[in-house]
């Protein structure tokens, strides 16, 4: 069947392009010699014009995601891993963690406030933890802002974005849905956190190779879509599924 052959051709081209990319990186000229030519030949991912550090915000958060300070980035990743292991593998519950933290805090304050009497010293002021009044309001505003920005981004891709941007978003959402069906919410958050701390730095290091590979995939998709359109889609009558106007 022609449709089956087209699908097989698409899969075969994906494998061939990936193999060619690996072989070029191994046997081709050096990366620094080809950087200018590759940059001018391929479109950047999501048609961006600015460096990846600027796209990520350009501040301390971007430095952490791009591992500008390896100690801080590694500490953040290890902290997230410890939390995930604590809740997922050890089956520790959030309520238990909060209660134990409050218990340790109360014991520490009790010892601090009463130690001066046992040691015959002047009573020192016990430090207290007080959250700012606007803390939760600022957190809610920040979360709502990011959610609205994500929704606006997806809607712009669906209504105004080109085919490359749309396909990247569709593939990303499909992969997220597959991962979500196999893991719980905490594991999905951890996978997303690890991806956010590894994929940007890997993309920055292999930026031209990734952009070139994606550009070649889009070109292959366009060619196979034209074959599918001329061989199958164009034969479907345009008014077959339309509703007839009634006076």
Curated annotation (Swiss-Prot):
Topology class, membrane: Multi-pass membrane protein
Gene Ontology, cellular component aspect: cytosol; endoplasmic reticulum membrane; mitochondrion
Keyword tRNA-binding: no
Domain of life: Eukaryota
Keywords linked to the UniProt accession: Endoplasmic reticulum, Membrane, Transmembrane, Transmembrane helix
Keyword Coiled coil annotated: no
Residue span, Reticulon domain: 61-247
Annotated transmembrane regions: 71-91, 92-112, 166-186
InterPro entries: Reticulon (IPR003388), Reticulon-like (IPR045064)
One GO biological process term: response to bacterium
Protein's name in the database: Reticulon-like protein B8
């Amino acid at each position: 069947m022609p449709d089956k052959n087209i699908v097989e051709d698409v899969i075969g081209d994906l494998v061939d392009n990936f193999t060619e990319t690996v072989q070029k990186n191994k046997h081709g000229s050096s990366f620094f010699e080809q950087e200018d030519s590759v940059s001018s030949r391929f479109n950047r991912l999501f048609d961006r014009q600015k460096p990846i550090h600027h796209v990520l915000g350009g501040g301390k958060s971007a430095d952490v995601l791009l591992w500008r300070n390896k100690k801080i980035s590694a500490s953040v990743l290890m902290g997230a891993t410890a939390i995930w292991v604590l809740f997922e593998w050890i089956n520790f519950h959030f309520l238990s963690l909060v209660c134990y933290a409050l218990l340790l805090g109360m014991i520490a304050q009790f010892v601090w406030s009463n130690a001066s009497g046992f040691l015959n010293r002047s009573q020192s002021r016990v430090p207290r933890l007080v959250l700012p009044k606007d803390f939760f309001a600022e957190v809610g505003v920040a979360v709502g802002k990011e959610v609205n920005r994500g929704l606006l981004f997806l809607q712009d891709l669906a209504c105004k974005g080109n085919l490359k941007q749309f396909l990247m978003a569709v593939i990303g959402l499909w992969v997220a849905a597959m991962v979500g069906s196999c893991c719980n919410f905490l594991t999905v958050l951890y996978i997303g956190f690890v991806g956010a701390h590894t994929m940007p730095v890997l993309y920055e290091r292999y930026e031209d190779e990734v952009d070139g590979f994606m550009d070649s995939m889009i070109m292959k998709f366009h060619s196979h879509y034209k074959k599918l359109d001329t061989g199958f889609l164009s034969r479907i009558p345009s008014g077959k599924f339309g509703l007839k106007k009634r006076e």
